[in-house]
């Protein structure tokens, strides 16, 4: 990076890749560039450190700890009780994330993450409730564009059963009173972690213990979620991000005209697609609302369900009414069947 800085003018440095967040921040500090600080980048990557900072700011989040031995892990389990979540310190999405219900399951998950040989992992309280996310483009620590989406069902539940047709739904009701607490808490998280001008992606839970923050990333969300926001709000979010980073302002105004969503229909098993049931019926009914889709050809190899929401067959829909959008996605999941051989 020093050679690059000497060879040519570098004005900004950004990344959408979670694993490069700290590297990019270190490079910015080395080159004297504006952007997310190395301290904030580390807090966004190190989940236990992030949650400790949030707890110190009295922001509700799961009890958690960094552990690097089976003894420390079991001590946390005895103190906190089950179920627990065990995952990498700086993981990506739900990759290598385990929900464990007993000491035996905890030991197996610890083996998978290398805790038994001294590798660090994050262990935390399992938070019961509905799961969603709050995304922003923020400037000087204040969200200038904000969006709210929901998972149906939770990410870990969707991974537990391939018969589930998992959905992501981006609401056009962001300004409603029912979301006020989430918006205020999201803004407090951004300020607490020192996130200045950046895209952010914050996951949350709402359940018997109220609203709790899961984690936040200083980057756009994955799964091409921004495409949902662009369609639903009649704006170019990618251009707005560039304007925020380069000019320190955002002129785009979200219309909130449409709710948008993505539903994935998984094959009945691994193998090769042999055909579809009710595909014609589905395509006919959703024609007015579908704006993107992927229907793998007969004979194509299936993709592991762990690969995310845009694997195998999927559909992206838009509708003026959020509830109607969700019902359409539910109907697709109930109706379409993907057969394999």
Where are the model-predicted features located?
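A short, glycine/Asx- and small/polar-enriched loop/turn
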Residues: 81, 206-212, 306-311
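A short, flexible beta-alpha/helix-coil linker loop
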Residues: 34, 90-93, 222
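Active-site nucleotide/adenylate-binding loops and adjacent lid/helix of ATP-dependent enzymes
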Residues: 43-122, 127-128, 139-141, 170-184, ...
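Conserved N-proximal alpha/beta basic substrate-recognition cap immediately N-terminal to
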Residues: 1-68, 75, 263, 305-311, ...
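ATP-dependent carboxylate/phosphate-activation module, predominantly the ATP-grasp catalytic core
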Residues: 104, 125-195, 199, 206, ...
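Peripheral (often C-terminal) accessory segments that flank ATP-dependent C-N-forming ligase machineries
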Residues: 56, 242-341
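Generic preference for hydrophobic
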Residues: 64, 86, 123, 145-148, ...
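Short acidic/polar active-site loop segments enriched in Thr and Asp
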Residues: 11, 119, 191
